[in-house]
Amino acid sequence: MRLAVIGGGWAGIAAAVEATAAGTEVTLIEAGRVLGGRARSVSIDGRTLDNGQHILLGAYRDTLALMRRVGADPETLLERRPLAIHDRSGFCMALPAWPAPLHLAWGLLTARPLSLREKLRTALWMDGIKRRGFRVDPDCSVAEWLDAAGQTGQLRCHLWEPLCVAALNTPAERASARLFANVLRDSLGSPRSGDTDLLLPRTDFGQLLPQPASRWLGQHGARLRFGQRVRSLSPGDHGILVDGEAFDCAILATAPQHARRLWPEIGNDFAYEPIATVNLEFGPKTALPFPLLNLDGRVGQWVVDRGNGILACVLSGQGNWSVLNDAALVATLEEELRDYTGNQRAGWNKVIREQRATFSARSGLERPKAETTHPRLLLAGDYTWADYPATLEGAIRSGLRAARLALSRN
């Protein structure tokens, strides 16, 4: 079978590797010069940076398995740390490396500054949603869900709402409670304590998957076409035509706005949310007290210590930050970080903005399935994995699913 995979992001990579491993003749077509999509490394001013700062969780089992499959060792490339959330106000919730659910119980019991009453209320709420299988009304927002549960205190401000924005890239007032519940189910609510671990890259994102996958695909006979933007898809006599070239099957693994341009029957376009990553380089001895910090500021959100004095500030969803120009944004973040940088100004900075970084994970959102109106055309991409918001794990799972569906139609 001749299979075209259109789009070389993480979903397209997963689809191409899965199909190639099964002996399929795969052609992977990517408009850019490298694989990786929105999670790739870029060279700027002689520095190798990530196109956007991403954090993986221990629950990303399919992502980790795919890394191993293409020869990228997660144990070497990722630093595994028990989940610990700290913010500038002094809030702290740290989970020990204990079996589940003891790790969560201890983390909640020792979280500060929280009243005993709030800890008990939260423990009962978490137990209740777990007993209900994390099922939530699909039309309910995260804010409405938290209101109904009486989650109105410190944990809402310092944990639930920041986690919501980080995981769904959508403010709690608009974000889907069902998707947020699914994230909690597979992390804090998982029966495996390691699922909550933070997996912090020791290297740039290109070396985690895109570059090893590119080598693996080439070594196993797949054709990689870079710099080719697909202009048309149309039904063929026995398959699908990609820019007039006949394939038995095709997997459309581009971002949804590009997929809809090629195949309008996919349906209505999504609303989108932006993400900015602000890279600030201070002196080499500058370091955060924690690898991950919630700035909890007027503008700043999450900060990741990349080592060697480089701090990556991640700003998700529409907010105060999105109306600031790059210079004003850098100056504001330098001010909010001054307690950790000794009032230094960054000697170098780079702001990377993605205006359509992810679909807006709103309540009641309808997501397309992998199947289309043409039996030989399948979709892949985080927007098609309806169980999750826009995550790398969702992208990987969608690509694997699309490849397996394509193989079943041979």
Model-identified regions with their sequence ranges:
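Glycine-rich active-site loop/strand segments that organize a redox cofactor
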Residues: 40-58, 126-130
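Conserved flavin/dinucleotide-binding core of flavoenzymes
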Residues: 303-410
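N-terminal Rossmann-like FAD-binding beta1-loop-alpha1 element of flavoenzymes
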Residues: 2-28
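Glycine-rich FAD pyrophosphate-binding loop
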Residues: 20-44
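Mobile amphipathic helical/loop "lid" adjacent to a hydrophobic cofactor/ligand pocket
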Residues: 60-64, 68-69, 73-182
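Mid-domain catalytic core of redox enzymes
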Residues: 22, 228-340, 368
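Helical element adjacent to the flavin cofactor pocket in flavoenzyme catalytic cores
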Residues: 183-239, 249
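Short beta-strand to alpha-helix junction loop
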Residues: 54-61, 136-138, 149, 191-216, ...
